[in-house]
A protein has these predicted regions:
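Active-site Tyr-X1-5-Lys
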Residues: 155, 171-193
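N-terminal Rossmann NAD(P)H-binding glycine-rich loop of SDR-like oxidoreductase domains
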Residues: 21, 25-48
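SDR active-site strand-loop-helix element
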Residues: 31, 56, 95-101, 141-147
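Conserved catalytic-core motifs of eukaryotic protein kinase domains, centered on the activation segment
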Residues: 65-67, 105-112, 152-159
Length: 193
C-alpha cells in the first residue's frame, strides 16, 4: 500500500469520528470569524436558524458572537495540521474562508501577507478537496472577492471605464489585491480538479 493511500485511510478513519469518538456533527466552518465580515456572517447565519456554525480566528471571539456558534477555536490557517484536526472534528459542508492579512498590513509585511493570504488559502482548499474525496461529497469553499483585485493605471482611465465587468481590469496594485486574485484562480483550479 502506498504511503499516500495509507495516510488517506488513516485520515478517513480519524475523520469519521470527532476527537472524543463521537460521530462528526454537520457544520459550516468560518475562518477569520473575528473580522467585520465574519461577525456579520455569523449573525446572519444565526438569524437564519443555523446552529452548526464553527468559527475560528487568531483571537478569541467576543461573548455575543461565541454564543451564536456551535464551536469556536483559536486557530491559524497557516497551521495545516491544526486546520486538518479541527476540520476532522466536524462533517463540514461549507467553509467561508475569511482569514486574511488586509491591504495596509500586507503592504508593510508582504511576506506575512503572502503566507497568510496564499498559504492559508491553499491549506483550506486542499483540506476541503481531501475531505471531499474521502467522503464522496464536495465541501463548498466560499472565498469573498475584493475591490483590491481590480486596478487602473490612472484616475482618468477609471472615470472613462464606467461600470466594470467581473473579468475586466484585473490588475491589482497592492500585495493584498495580488494575493486575492491569485487565490481566486487557485479556487478555480481546485474546483476543476
Amino acid at each position: 500500500m502506498s504511503s499516500k493511500s495509507t495516510k488517506e485511510e488513516a485520515m478517513k478513519s480519524s475523520m469519521s469520528e470527532g476527537s472524543l469518538g463521537h460521530p462528526r456533527q454537520p457544520a459550516v466552518f468560518i475562518t477569520g470569524a473575528g473580522g467585520e465580515v465574519g461577525h456579520g456572517l455569523i449573525s446572519a447565519l444565526h438569524l437564519d436558524g443555523r446552529e452548526d456554525i464553527v468559527a475560528t480566528d487568531l483571537r478569541e471571539l467576543d461573548q455575543t458572537t461565541r454564543e451564536m456558534c456551535g464551536g469556536t477555536y483559536l486557530a491559524d490557517v497557516c497551521d495545516r495540521d491544526a486546520m486538518e484536526r479541527l476540520l476532522s472534528m466536524y462533517q463540514v459542508t461549507e467553509i467561508f474562508h475569511l482569514a486574511a492579512v488586509l491591504s495596509s498590513r500586507a503592504e508593510f509585511a508582504p511576506e506575512v501577507g503572502h503566507q497568510v493570504n496564499v498559504g492559508g488559502t491553499i491549506n483550506i482548499l486542499q483540506i476541503a478537496a481531501d475531505q471531499g474525496r474521502m467522503y464522496g461529497k464536495p465541501v463548498k469553499v466560499i472565498f469573498p472577492s475584493s475591490i483590491a483585485t481590480y486596478g487602473f493605471s490612472t484616475i482618468r482611465q477609471k472615470m472613462k471605464a464606467g461600470a466594470v465587468g467581473e473579468h475586466e481590469f484585473l490588475k491589482p496594485r497592492t500585495m493584498y489585491g495580488c494575493n486575492k486574485l491569485y487565490c481566486e484562480n487557485l479556487g478555480r483550479y481546485y474546483a476543476c480538479s
